[in-house]
């Protein structure tokens, strides 16, 4: 066994074509089939547990759960044999309880099943032509009863047992409705159909003997004990959205044109429409009963709830539930047109689950249906939108935990394997064949039937930004670095770059369709494999094959490489896994009777996983073993289409033809996860376009304004309500006060009455007590008397029993005496018999002795007779012996002769055997050659068949396109007429629109001008405000200075006034004046004024030096740039001169070739004149000239193309030079001048003429 273990972790998908495919295990857990498993899914906690199907199972057909929810029955086909497996759901993990697979009757498969109410019995229905209904006691694997359900082999859709009675059984089918009762080991029909039979699709028990039955014409019947009690017809109702869409479509066009992508012809389309009109009746595919009534499907996307009318035997429609339209669908009006195939209520009847024919699960809370009165309620997705067809593409990325899948249901989906959710999905008009996810997780490449599209993964959308005309691309893959991606077109590989989005390489070499691509780790090589049996390794730098391994007998399905890219692993149709290295097959590991469909290897190179055609996966350890050393796991219900490992080797991802996606956790044998440390966590960034952000910002603004408005409205409403409620409260308080007063009076009255009643009750109680005491005394007296009587009777009975005991003892003694007498008599009787038998025995012994004596005498006589006979025989054989000896001598001579002949013949035989061995070896060689040739023939036949198919497809496509063209030409006239009318209607509106647009542009210009003016004015205002603040500060400083000066002047005046008093005394006056000078005039002021002037001069000189230095550096930069531009210009001029020289040389060659052509043409004219004279010579010369002329013409075309390319290059370079000349500071060199292209063009045209 392998040491690699995979454990199923989560599944995205619902298995189709299973009867009763969803159940509730409890309020939170549901059970549904997915792949080759049944899944227990917790709705609240979002976990899944798996119940694996049987080994080598070919598919589940039907499910059934017991009423006590302990057992689950699964009908499946195991190794082409039907079987019913019953699991015990209460055990963890769920274990098999019983397997019903030994049958005494013919059975192909079980199509429907049901448990009895007590879960002891199981009812199963087999498929036609047997159509047996079997009633099992399943725990003992015993068939209790079996009956043929329908003698006409009509299909049976559903069987069930009554919800309260084990013995009542109901079956419904095409023209079949039977009620049966199990009694005395048989099933007997208790109802008989009257009138026309219908196609009964579903039924449900609503009570012990009542059944609701639905038909394909939208009718519901209620049967009670086989008699019809009620009937109704479901009316077709369309949702408002679909009606509005139809009205719009009718108003847009009176004639319906077929879509361009539809290959169906108009006649076939009419047939389809008639069929759809016939099938417009709502078909009742599912019915589920609950306590209030029942729910039933009523046509596409519609479920009706019926409730029982009280005290009557019929039901009325109470609610309608619809499947919502899917806005991500390519046709939202048709997305809700799904048939509901199964309905299921939770145990508390709080939730209803529905499954549809498009493999979707929907749920609804029943309380919501009661809230939505008048309008139809809508289902919600129980999980998320799932794939409804085969998944064809799978990929994952490095930077995010994302999985990308695409399917034949025309959808692309992005899943998150970390949170097990659906991130994005979108449906398209074309089928998607392959998908590849960029390592960053921001882009995907999808191959559609019409084109290859490169798309962005936005936050809520998948939006294409580049399309390539690669039709029907079945394989594509991003490189590990993400800078390249490869796409397959039939047998050709295109390599595109993600930077310039151009096709940089085309790899050709395969002769068949390419099935698989894989890049090596450094993206330098690409490995491809296809149906032609070829595995190629391409070198992308050269575009050539480096290694190749071709085995035409094998059609490869998948390929992968080891991490070091030295070994290639390939799987295909020959049931082997091949190890290829250096173009040689190193080993072939057998697949043991299955075909490997896909393969992947871990990034560590130690684990290999392969998917098989029967839906299983195998985990192997590398290096591989030739023995069965692998672990095999049940996975899908069909071939595994794709599989891969995540970048950290933690999870295995697989997709299948059944439309399911599995995620597996990978472990080693000890249960440890294979750890690869992530250096960086998963990225959380998403792509959002600028327009989306602006729209969302606008929406947010609008919503904010709306919220403000609503707040205002709510406040106003609240104030109104407060006023109303205060008034009501006042009214109620007044009312309640009045009522309280009235109640108080009533209470007083009642108290008085109560007191009266208490008095009367006391009197009555006293009377009753007296009466009871009297009765008790009477009873005691009676009981005493009865006791005395009973005691007397007891004594009498005791005496009787003593007497009877004495009698019985006497009888026992008598019996013992009689017994001993009887024993003595018997012994005497048997002793007499014994004596008689001994006498008889002695007589018999004497007879035996007499017989022995007689035997001895007869023996002697026989011996004597035998001796005589022996003597006679002896003489006879002696005579014969003599004769034989004579003949023996004669034969010895003959044998000598024959021995010589034998030796010669033996030599011949040895020679012949040697010849035969040589021929056998030649035959083996020839057989090997024949086998290889047969394999080649088969491969060629397959190739021819595939090419024929492609040719037929293309011819069919051409035919369909021709038909479409004819139809479109028919409708062209009508469309032209409509276009003219619409143009007439549109012209005035367009003029108005133009006028309005001009007005809007003018207004926008004015608005921009006003905005600019406003900004300029705001700037001016800020500048002025700053200036104002500065002037205010200066003004305050000046005012302060002014105040200081005024104070100084006042002080000076006072001091001067004091000095005036000494005017008559000069000496004192002089001293006072000197004191004033010293007080008011200071030397520091003078020094400060001089210092300020010197500082200003220094600052000015410093700034000047700085500006001069900057100017010098800028001059140097300008000179350097000019020199650089000059060198570039000289180089370009030199290139142009060389190119013009080449052109002139090519023109000279062209002129020579033309002159040669002219000479040859003149020679031809001469040869035409002399044709009649020399016919054969002229023919030869004509052939020669024709061949030379064709050669010359081809050369002429080639030279013309070269000249055209050179001319375009020269023009491009001239434009480049002009752009360079327009750059400021760039000057042309006066010495260099190019020859004019115009003159050369004129010369060229003259020569050509």
UniProtKB/Swiss-Prot annotation:
UniProt GO cellular component terms: cytoplasm; cytoskeleton; sperm flagellum
Keyword field: Cell projection, Coiled coil, Cytoplasm, Cytoskeleton, Repeat, WD repeat
SUPFAM superfamilies in UniProt: Quinoprotein alcohol dehydrogenase-like (SSF50998), WD40 repeat-like (SSF50978)
Keyword Cell division: no
UniProt tissue specificity: Predominanly expressed in testis, lung and skin. Weak expression in brain and kidney.
Xref: InterPro entries: Beta-prop_EML-like_2nd, CFA-57, Quinoprotein_ADH-like_sf, WD40/YVTN_repeat-like_dom_sf, WD40_repeat_dom_sf, WD40_rpt
Main location: cytoplasm
Entry's localization field: Cytoplasm, Cytoskeleton, Cilium axoneme
Annotated GO biological process: axonemal dynein complex assembly; cilium organization; single fertilization; sperm flagellum assembly
Pfam families: Beta-prop_EML_2
Coiled-coil zones: 690-1056, 1094-1165
Residue stretches spanning the membrane: none
PROSITE patterns per UniProt: WD_REPEATS_2, WD_REPEATS_REGION
Extent of the WD repeats: 105-148, 195-233, 335-374, 386-425, 427-469, 471-506, 509-548, 635-674
Keyword Transcription regulation: no
Protein family per UniProt: Belongs to the CFAP57 family.
Role played: Associates with components of the nexin-dynein regulatory complex (N-DRC), a key regulator of ciliary/flagellar motility, and might act as an inner dynein arm (IDA) hub or linkage.
Subunit record text: May form homodimers. Associates with components of the nexin-dynein regulatory complex (N-DRC) and the CFAP184:CFAP263 complex.
Name listed for the protein in its UniProt record: Cilia- and flagella-associated protein 57
Organism: Mus musculus
